[in-house]
Amino acid sequence: RTIDYAVVEDYVFNIEAKYGVTVMGLGFDRMNCLSSAQKWENGREANEFHPASAGYTVCEVKQHSSVLHPATKWLSEMITDGKFAYEANDLLEINFENARCTFDTNLNRYVNKKRSAGKVDMVVALINAVHMLQQNALFGEALEWGAIVI
């Protein structure tokens, strides 16, 4: 299957207006996303189809166990403790059912796409969002904000 990146890019540009939220930043996986990330960072001018949109702060999230372990562990703990809330989403639940975690030699936990039982993209995107949230808490202002996974 192929993906129409223009549809995804437009969806992201329209999130603020559609949901009444403020996008604080976008974390992305380098694989197949560099062009989109550059467009999101630069923003877009108004045209007959779309209003103008300011650029966003974008940050590559390295897809490595040493980077994603803290977010994966915290998300797992939040789910286990019943502290994780989300909008009803059957596809996200299926992605969680498919996900298989493994540990590297340093006991860093990560979702292993090759060992998973099917699609896990939404879970990985959620882990990336949790990573961004943790980075903001550690290095940015202590803002109260959440994440949306598309």
Predicted regions and their residues:
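Short, surface-exposed amphipathic charged segments that create phosphate/polyanion-binding patches used
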Residues: 71-81
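RNase H-like, metal-dependent nuclease domains and their acidic two-metal-ion catalytic environment used
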Residues: 1-63, 69, 73, 86-150
